[in-house]
Amino acid sequence: MSVKWERDSDAPKGTLTFDIDTETIQKGIDHAFTRTQKRISVPGFRKGHVPRTIFNQMYGEESLYQDALNDVLPDAYEAAIKEAGIEPVDQPQVNVESMEKGQPWTLTATVAVKPEVTLGDYKGMEVPEQDTSVSDADVDSELENKRQQQAELVLKEDEAAADGDTVVIDYEGSVDGEKFDGGSADNYSLVLGSGSFIPGFEDQLVGHKAGEDVDVNVTFPEDYHAKDLAGKDALFKVKIHEVKEKQLPELDDEFAKDVDEDVETLAELKDKVKKQLQDQKEAAAKAAIEDAAIEAAVANAETEEIPQAMLDDDTNRQLQQYLAGMQQQGINPQMYFQITNTTEDDLRKQFADDAAKRVKTNLVLEAVVKDANLNATDEDVQNEIADLAKQYGMDEEAVSKALTRDMLEHDIEIKKAVDLIADSAKQTAKAADKD
């Protein structure tokens, strides 16, 4: 196969010229005739049985060329781009330059390819200093969260409701004496001070006891989501059925055992909480260092203009992953759009706004892979398969079938590039001051 690649000097695209040999062409013509023969009728012959010579006399072999080209072009194009060593990022625009009988066919394809990257410094990036220390106050705060989670609601028999208490109420609202949709409920549990209701509602229940009827006068905010109620005064008739207060458990060994069956004392729980917080801070610090170092490396690099096809592919991929994630969590995307008053196009635009940054980042990481000669070994691939199988609850054979080796190697090499950039980064207070 004769292949010639001429890259444009001012954009990530070029012209690929390639030939299709006569043997391949003849096979394509033969297949085209077989398909055509089945659907044509010629006087004197049964449908589907016209001889090749008669067909050629009546229609000419050239009538099969376009069908034959459609048959052989995909494989010929794939072979040509492989020989040229290019990575197309969009469907090519193919033109036939010559299609003569008995001669190789010559074609040209206008091909958009990955932009070239000129790397700057990517090792030793200055990143904000990360604080991974865990204080006693951090531990105390986490223990207090656990106390809140273990709290019980206890009835206040003859005591007034206070901020933080839970009241069980019936309420019915009206504006100018008229009831409105969503303005009433029975046996509703409301935490006073939570800000769940419109401003002023919860405050007016503080100081009242179970069994009391309370008139609550409020004004809907000007920016209230129901436009017909925005800015209007409303009266709510409220009946208080119960008042409950939160009782927190004592911070002692019994509490520790209730919270975590693997510990026996409060001291052990504190140590375990401190270790968990330490792990969380170190993981967050690692992620922050990676993000900052990669961002700096990307800023130091230069790329050609990114083809629109790459931006569109990235946007579509992000959108589909997001929608798939919704469905995995049991969320109906159409219901989500209805509730949030958005559309799929709104979501697509959000992803499109950051597509250039994501694509450039990936291009730079791929360039680092080449520059640093980072390769995925057989052991790397096997470990990646094992990790993915564990992560998704699949067997390793299923993972191997779902992902090609090229995909696995690419992901591994990108991770190695990320590690190389992040591990060589320098944490400095100066970088933190810049932020």
From Swiss-Prot:
InterPro entries associated with the record:
PPIase_dom_sf, PPIase_FKBP_dom, Trig_fac, Trigger_fac_C, Trigger_fac_C_sf, Trigger_fac_ribosome-bd_bac, Trigger_fac_ribosome-bd_sf, Trigger_fact/SurA_dom_sf
Segments passing through the bilayer: none
GO BP annotations, alphabetical order: 'de novo' cotranslational protein folding; cell division; chaperone-mediated protein folding; protein transport; protein unfolding
Where in this protein does the record put region Disordered? 125-147
- A GO cellular-component term linked to this record: cytoplasm
- Ranges for domain PPIase FKBP-type come to 164-249
Q: Which reaction does this enzyme catalyse, per its entry?
A: [protein]-peptidylproline (omega=180) = [protein]-peptidylproline (omega=0)
Q: HAMAP family from the xrefs?
A: Trigger_factor_Tig (MF_00303)
Function, as annotated, reads:
Involved in protein export. Acts as a chaperone by maintaining the newly synthesized protein in an open conformation. Functions as a peptidyl-prolyl cis-trans isomerase.
What is this protein called in UniProt? Trigger factor
- What organism does the record attribute this protein to? Limosilactobacillus fermentum (strain NBRC 3956 / LMG 18251)
Name of the coding gene? tig
